[in-house]
Amino acid sequence: MLFPVKRLIIENTGYKRDISLRTMYINSSSIASITDYDGATEFLLRENSDLQDKSFSLIKLNNIADDIIALGSAQQIYSTVREHKTGKHLLHD
């Protein structure tokens, strides 16, 4: 079952970095682990970003080397995964 997360995107534009959030959909059966990630907060503080007061999680996926830094605590994301796994949803929701 696919569920939405807001992924932290950091793009190096030369002398500064552009920081944004982008919605992406993850298949819940491909998740290996979800952990709280304090490293994002420390980085955002250094970059003086307006996202510095938010919590972030590190999502590790099976068979993919790239990890996802997502907006929300590990508990919040886990709750979203469980909600999408147990509930019936229309494909376009």
Predicted segments, located by residue:
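Acidic, Ser/Thr- and proline-rich intrinsically disordered linker/docking segments
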Residues: 3-4, 9-12, 16-25, 30-93
